[in-house]
Amino acid sequence: MNKFCLLPFHGKRIGVANIPFTILFKKGPCFLHSHITAVYYSTKGKNDSHEQSRVSKKSTFTPLETPWYLRIVDNEKELMEGKKNNHHTMNKELEIPKTSPNSLRKIADLLTGKLGLDDFLVFDLRKKSPNSVSAVNKLGDFMVICTARSTKHCHKSFLELNKFLKHEFCSSAYVEGNFNERQESRRKRRLARKSNLSKLLGRSSECSAKDLNSEAWYMIDCRVDGIFVNILTQRRRNELNLEELYAPENEKSKFQNIDSGNVPTISGVNEISSNNNILLGLRRLAQQRRRYSTINPNGLSNLRYFLQKEDFKGANKIIQSSSGTETHNIRTLEHVKNTLKDLVGQERKVDVVQWKSLFDEHSTFLTINQSAAYWPLRLEYAILLNKADPQFYSDRVFLKDYLLLKKSLGQELIREDLIALLEMVLKTQHSSHSYFNLVKQNRVIIRALNLFKGLQTEDDGSVVYDEEVISLLLNSMVADERVKLRSLYETIDHIFQTFGDKLTSGMIVSILQNLAKIKDWNKLLQVWEAITPTEGEGQDKRPWNEFINVINQSGDSHVISKIVNNGHLLWIRRLNVNVTPELCNSIKALLKTAGMENSTLEEFLVRGTNNQ
């Protein structure tokens, strides 16, 4: 052990005690030991005696095992080792569907290994039930969700994933949520403009631009085996909670956002900062909608008075002055609808444009309960507008104003919506029954049918295969004897292949009527014979009464004589058809037209059946 001492020094008029300082050097860390002597000095004359009072106090410092600056490297090593261990355990616990393709495993290894994305989840969308089909099931088979550390990490991960897909699978990914420099500059200008407007309105928007730029969501279509990859920042993932959307029905409860209130969203930050502004709170209190009604008892009668006169300015004033609860708003719209119904029933000419704008202006979409009461009301109102002026509120307007609007707002279309459109198509009158006008109508129907794909009726059948829907569809394909769509025969064949022996009487009658309308008697008889039962007697449930009426109403003597002379009516006795009074009258009328009234055939078909 080496010892180094500092010698004491003397000063004038100061009594100093020897203060030895000793520094000990060892092989380990160095420590400082000191023996401190307290000194009192005087400013009196030279002759004054020096009064010295020595109070010695020893203080020792407890040595640390390892200084902080020597622990930095060790802590970093432990942190790196912990990350490696977590990464290995995460790879071991990585769950991928068993029947998934090898490409999904390669993409998962890239995301969790090289790119360092966390919280990796894979949802298999192939096993979804038909009742819970969404747009995602139509697009892909596997949905991947993972978390990035920042927006730059999201962008870098997308670039690396795109390079990997090009190299491994010769596929270029499609991404949503990636902003280029021009879009980012445009976004910043909008945020700056929004912040300026917020300052004028007394709102605080200090953190809005910063918060929006610090969160990201990249949705990537790999275009490989139906794989979609979602890369999100942690806060954005907590806000969106995509896991609950993609999870199966029996596992959605596992991903419900229970602690979502603790996540500080962007809107929440702005709301907290704005609530601290007292003036803003007073302004919001003054501008908020009242949740009580101030309408007088005669309000509805006054509204009806203005609507009957078509004074829409006065009607608007009454509705705005009485705006209250959601139930009251629905009741007001019902009153408007009933007034229009009375005017249309009286065949009065109404201003359809003003009536439509009045209903749209006071329509709201606030809650699920209100939407459930609103859409049937809007459907009835649209039918009344079409009845009042089919040229203005045509089938094309109904498609955009009702069907597309309802679908875009997340509401489910129902059977009555499609029937209403088909009835409007049939009511639309053109100046001439040309083939091109019929094609235009058919295009509207095709666009509407695309909206109803995958929708089921109460009987677990497709809405498109409903009996009334099929009847209206067939009627829309025929204008007259000369004008018909070329797809009519293909549609009839498709109906026979789809239903087979389960064809209903309504479908058969609709097919017969449309074939009789175009006077294709050979196809009509071919269809009628194709549905003849073969299992034995007593099984013939074909609509004989409607079949005979269609033949008789044609007035074609050649067709009628062919039906009678070729023995088609004899199948009534052979298959023991239940001859009702209506069928008896139809047989008599047909034989009378054929000139065989009171004949042996009539007695055999009608009277012989009555004797049984």
UniProtKB/Swiss-Prot annotation:
It is a peripheral membrane protein. It comes from the Eukaryota. The keyword Lipid metabolism does not apply. The keyword Mitochondrion applies. GO terms for cellular component: mitochondrial inner membrane. Its main location: mitochondrion. Residues 1-14 form a transit peptide. Keywords: Membrane, Mitochondrion, Mitochondrion inner membrane, Transit peptide. It is found in: Mitochondrion inner membrane. GO terms for biological process: mitochondrial gene expression; mRNA stabilization. Belongs to the ATP25 family. mRNA stabilization factor specific for the 0.95 kb OLI1 mRNA. Also involved in OLI1 ring formation. This is ATPase synthesis protein 25, mitochondrial. It comes from Saccharomyces cerevisiae (strain RM11-1a). The gene is ATP25.
